[in-house]
Structures are given as C-alpha cells and as structure tokens.
C-alpha cells in the first residue's frame, strides 16, 4: 500500500533541503528588498515600528512584480496561516481570517529566512504527523469555500506554492547576481 502522506511530506522535504533552503544562503538586506522594476510589491515599514506585506488578499490583474522579501513572506505565511488554522488554533476562524495572520512581518533578510524556516518546520512537522484518515478528511468550515476538499489537497496546494515561489526566488537571486553584467 502506498503511503501518500509520506510522499507529500518527502516531496516538500526534498524541495526544501535540495533547492529552496540552499538558495537563501548569503541573502543580504539589499537583495531581500531589491526592486528590479518600478512599483514592486514588497514588505515596507508600517509606520508603527514593524513591517507590512503589500497586497495581502488582493488579486489585481496583471499581478505586480514582487521582491524577494514579498515572495519569502508569501511562502512563509502560506504555511503559517494553514498551520494556525488547522493545527494550533482551536477557534473556528477559517483559513482566510486575518486572525491567523502572523503577528509581525520580517523586514530584513536574516529575519525573513528565520521566519520562513520556522513556518516551514511547523507546517512540515504537523503534516508529517497526519494519519491516512486525517489526510482524507474534508477541511470542513475552516477551509472556507474549500470545505469539502481533503487535507491532502491543501498539502498539495501548499507544496505547489512553495515550489512555484521558491523557483521564483532562485531566479530573482540569479538576476540580482548578474544585474550588472554586460553582454559580450
């Protein structure tokens, strides 16, 4: 019998260990906040001593270009919000409720990486502990309009988000590193 839970978790682990986490080594504050084009979405000072994440729950078309900071926070919050909703918060707020949003957003590279690592580890450890029956169970009211979808579908979605935005993080790091090179 196939252990689908182990497959989902090992997919995320492999991507994190072999691709995303190593690509974050050496990230500087300048690069974290680098805006390669005008009007990027990023993280910005919020005027209260913290930082805010541009565009939360907005879906403009076309989507704005986003910085490394935005992408790192987006990946981290995708995991942390679902961890809060389905594993650590005993309330009844669905996964789109702002009460699941992290208390603070990281404004520099070191804090951004630490935030992402913590969110990854928390999400990973909770999904790794799920039984086959828990993977098949519908999300219920906490899933909002995805209430009838199984937990496994949410894990597939979060894995896809981590890999999609993680790949973008890698490309942005390459662009930053080569931004001043001249054509031969």
Named regions from a protein language model:
Residues 3-102, 140-184:
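Short, contiguous alpha-helical
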Residues 100-136, 152-163:
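Acidic/histidine-rich alpha-helical segments that form the ligand environment
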């Amino acid at each position: 019998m196939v252990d689908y839970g182990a497959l989902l978790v090992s997919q995320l682990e492999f991507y994190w260990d072999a691709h995303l986490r190593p690509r974050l080594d050496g990230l500087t504050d300048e690069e974290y906040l680098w805006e390669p084009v005008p009007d990027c979405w990023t993280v910005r000072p919020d005027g209260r001593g913290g930082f805010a994440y541009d565009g939360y729950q907005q879906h403009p078309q076309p989507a704005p270009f986003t910085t490394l900071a935005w992408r790192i926070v987006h990946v981290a919050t995708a995991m942390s919000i679902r961890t809060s909703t389905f594993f650590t918060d005993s309330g009844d707020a669905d996964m789109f409720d702002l009460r699941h949003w992290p208390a603070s957003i990281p404004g520099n590279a070191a804090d951004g990486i630490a935030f992402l690592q913590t969110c990854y580890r928390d999400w990973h450890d909770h999904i790794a502990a799920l039984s086959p029956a828990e993977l098949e169970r519908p999300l219920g009211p906490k899933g909002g309009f995805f209430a009838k979808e199984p937990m496994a579908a949410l894990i597939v979605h979060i894995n896809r988000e981590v890999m999609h935005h993680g790949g973008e993080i890698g490309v942005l790091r390459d662009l930053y590193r080569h931004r001043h090179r001249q054509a031969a």
